């Protein structure tokens, strides 16, 4: 099997209308279609889907570091932070990082899904780890 790439991201949400507003305002996602319990967006070429599932437990999501990270230019980090603050988005306390690890801001959607705007690349991270993390094995 040959994986061609990422097909889509789908998030379960408790309130479709509230989540549509969030994804449009925070990510500038273009709404493509909306049904009774589903919405599809184009997020800079990424297919983003929301499914409304009102009655599922959501508390455990707060305990996990699982998140979706989007790349942004370092020069845009401060304006991204101000944009999130202006929208009253729940911004999370970031973790301590070395300068080589670049910069990030973490935040959640109304259902607690975690997101990150990150200024680094995989190549930069691997170089940093090769240089500084001698306990790691590279393939």
UniProtKB/Swiss-Prot annotation:
| HAMAP family noted in UniProt | FosB
Q: Which gene encodes it?
A: fosB
The compartments listed are: Cytoplasm
Cysteine pairs forming cystine bridges in this chain are none
List the lineage, top down: Bacteria, Bacillati, Bacillota, Bacilli, Bacillales
GO annotations of cellular component type: cytoplasm
EC class (word): transferase
| A Gene Ontology biological process term | response to antibiotic
**Name of protein:** Metallothiol transferase FosB
The record's listing under PROSITE patterns reads: VOC
Q: Which GO terms describe its molecular function?
A: magnesium ion binding; transferase activity, transferring alkyl or aryl (other than methyl) groups
What are the EC numbers?
2.5.1.-
| Keyword Electron transport included in the entry's annotation | no
Q: List keywords of the entry alphabetically.
A: Antibiotic resistance, Cytoplasm, Magnesium, Metal-binding, Transferase
């Amino acid at each position: 099997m040959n994986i061609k790439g990422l097909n889509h991201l789908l998030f379960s949400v408790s309130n479709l209308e509230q989540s549509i507003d969030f994804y449009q305002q925070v990510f500038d996602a273009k709404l493509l279609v909306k049904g009774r319990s589903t919405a599809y967006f184009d997020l800079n070429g990424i297919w983003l889907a929301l499914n409304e599932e009102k009655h599922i437990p959501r508390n455990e999501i707060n305990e996990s570091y699982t998140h979706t990270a989007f790349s942004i230019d370092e020069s845009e980090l401060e304006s991204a932070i101000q944009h999130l603050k202006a929208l009253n988005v729940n911004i999370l306390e970031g973790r301590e990082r070395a300068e080589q690890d670049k910069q990030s801001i973490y935040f959640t959607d109304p259902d607690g899904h975690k997101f990150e705007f990150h200024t680094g690349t995989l190549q930069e991270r691997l170089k940093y780890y090769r240089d500084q993390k001698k306990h790691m094995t590279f393939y």
